[in-house]
Swiss-Prot record:
Disruption phenotype: Under nitrogen-limited conditions, mutant shows a considerably changed growth rate and a prolonged lag phase. Level of NifH is significantly decreased. Keywords: Activator, DNA-binding, Metal-binding, Transcription, Transcription regulation, Zinc, Zinc-finger. A zinc finger (C4-type) spans 3-36. InterPro entries: Znf_CPxCG-like. Involved in nitrogen regulation. Enhances the transcription of the nitrogen fixation (nif) operon under nitrogen-limited conditions. Acts by binding to the nifH promoter region. GO terms for molecular function: DNA binding; zinc ion binding. This is Nif-regulating protein A. It comes from Methanosarcina mazei (strain ATCC BAA-159 / DSM 3647 / Goe1 / Go1 / JCM 11833 / OCM 88). Induction: Induced by nitrogen-limited conditions. It comes from the Archaea. Interacts with the general archaeal transcription factors TBPs.
Amino acid sequence: MHCLECGLVYIVSGLKVPEKISVRVFVNRIEHPFTHWVKLNAGELLREDEEIILDKVKTGYGSPFVITSLQIGVRRVPSALAEELDTIWARPLNEITFAKRRKIRQKHPMSFENITSTAGTSTASEYLEVVDES
């Protein structure tokens, strides 16, 4: 059992869990957000960033949805069992833009230009070729 006041989970013996659990899914679409109910298997573990499929006929939207947040009571959690959930927050997969990761090279504070030779020794630039990779 999950306590809605303190948030702790207690083990209760003899309690039968139903086969299917109805959980509310709030879909945050750009044009038209909507609420939908989905039936999940008892004991199914859901996590943020997982995909969930809703009924195309009832939602009118055929794209898979990405779980953006899971809500238990008033708390948002990264993962939860189906029977603990109050609300699943989701967005259509085609409305999510993934940030491009740019490869950023940092220059070392001690560049070859700062290395000077002392009497009778050669500089690093005589043995190494400086290549610009940008």
